[in-house]
């Protein structure tokens, strides 16, 4: 338990950040799941549309430090490859 005033403040800030990051992480997973669901359904148009909306979200989370920039690149690359495979 935090004893000093500054430690209490840091504990409050930490909890606030944890909740905020959890919310953003959930949002990221939701957008990625929408793309994956469209890919699994075999619908190229809706998969592309979902990917276009998910792409800036993934980039933003990488910028905010929620995920590593290489992980963001990996997400985008793999999803895009699956979408291209649908078109072929």
From Swiss-Prot:
Segments for region (Disordered): 1-27
SUPFAM superfamilies: Ribosomal protein S20 (SSF46992)
Keyword hit for rRNA-binding: yes
A single GO molecular function term of this UniProt record: structural constituent of ribosome
Pfam families: Ribosomal_S20p
A cellular-component GO term for this protein: cytosol
Basic residues bias (residue ranges): 1-21
Keywords of this entry: Ribonucleoprotein, Ribosomal protein, RNA-binding, rRNA-binding
InterPro entries (UniProt xref): Ribosomal_bS20 (IPR002583), Ribosomal_bS20_sf (IPR036510)
GO-annotated biological processes: translation
Stated role: Binds directly to 16S ribosomal RNA.
Entry similarity comment: Belongs to the bacterial ribosomal protein bS20 family.
Protein name: Small ribosomal subunit protein bS20
Species name: Shewanella piezotolerans (strain WP3 / JCM 13877)
């Amino acid at each position: 338990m935090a004893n000093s005033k500054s430690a209490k403040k840091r504990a409050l800030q930490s909890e606030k950040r944890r909740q905020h990051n959890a919310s953003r992480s959930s949002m990221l997973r939701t957008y990625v799941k929408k793309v994956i669901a469209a890919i699994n359904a075999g619908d190229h148009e809706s998969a592309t549309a979902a990917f276009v909306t998910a792409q800036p979200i993934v980039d933003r989370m990488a910028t905010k430090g929620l995920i590593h920039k290489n992980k963001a690149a990996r997400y985008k690359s793999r999803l895009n490859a699956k979408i291209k495979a649908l078109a072929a």
